[in-house]
Amino acid sequence: MPMKPENLTQQGRRLLDRRGFLKTAGLSTAALALAQLLDNDDLLAKDPRTVGGKVPIRPGVDPANPYLPRKAHFPMPARQVLVIYCPGAVSHVDTFDYKPALNKLHGKKPPSIPAVTFEGPTGNISRPFWKFRPRGQTGKMVSDLLPGLADQVDDFCFFHALTTETSAHPQGENFMNTGFTMEGFPSFGSWATYALGTERQELPAFVAINDPRGLARSGKNNFGNGFLPAAFQGTDFNSSNPPNNLQRPKNLSPEADRGTVELLKRLNARHLEKYPGDADLAGRIASYELAGRMQTSVPEVMDLAGEPEKVLEEYGVSGGSKLRGEYARNCILARRLLEKGVRVVQLFNGSDPSGGNGITNWDSHSNIADTHAMQAEIMDQPTAALIADLKRSGMLEHTLVVWATEFGRMPFLQANGTGRDHNPGAFTCFLAGAGVKKGFSYGESDEFGFKAAVDKTTVHDFNATLLHLMGLDHERLTFYHNGLERRLTNVHGHVVTDVLA
């Protein structure tokens, strides 16, 4: 039965008003005509999911089995990734980025450079604190600070014109590891495991091995899952601190333990039947099951007792500082995790806080000669041994090694005359292994190492290249969150094809 106007609400009567109807209809017709004209001229906004033909690829993740292996977007050699992260900002001009002009202008005021930087007034230009020498067959100039890594430069692919968006450590760590300066976004390792899963189910797909001194400045955000399913966050432990509650209580027999686990499985399965499609519940059940498998697999992988004495010597487990010994054991643990098929291993060399006698990372606003030397003694030999071990075993053919820090340091000293300030305008990272050129350098900073000058590379470009080496299109690997197709590279970045082997 038709509704009579007198029975309508005031709002309904307005909708039926003849004059209003004709006006609205006319505007709608005009809007349709305008849309057609704009579309003809290719000026109409497109569906963001299909701009440039880039339709998102959201992995089909089974919440009950989130770690099942998934196919890459295209074939590439990198099946696993080792990220060696050095918090605090390693000085590129004292390690891998040789600048002869610093020797020539040592002690002079820097030309055309701000009088004040991140932590105060600018001092004078300073030559490198360590001598640079040509290394390997390529003759790459590397300083004496890192002799172990210097011997391997023929296997490395350097990025010398990296830039970042911030000069603060927490935001810099976030940006390097998650693609955003703010917290709450998924880390690189989370994106990689969300896309690919893992070949082995008895260990986490993504493990973060923290420095013996603790977490880095941005804490667990460096390996967090953000808005991705919780299954893809990094599981953090190191050679001295295994995950909690791995050992069976002494008053619980193996039979009783297995019975408890089986009962829990049945109860969880029954509970899930009541709530089909509940991804959070299925994810929690999957995490419980992984924890059960880890009770056997983690103690086995952490048991370094079977490592030959020669290997322990190569890594520098003994004969150096206590911290070097602990970091060396972490490096061996990283190798063992990769051998067991863990997809992404993130190894930290540095923590928070820093300063004074409590130096815990590469931050060097004062006494850089001492602080960098201390960190190098911890990092260099074990890291070089780890990379050499991967090469010797053949694992480097399918493992991508990433050595990274959040930004560089200034070519001039701070006013105190003994340290270098933060430099977001230029810094160096390197890759090795699967899919990258060997003995190659990409990009250049200016003559002082102050700004990126040739082939400037953003962090988004760097991360896009890492994903590409794993067979993943950074523009199509997305997760729908808060109305947006989120990406590791936000809406930026391009693959640096010049570094691909």
Language model regions located:
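Ligand-binding pockets and gating/stacking loops
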Residues: 2-501
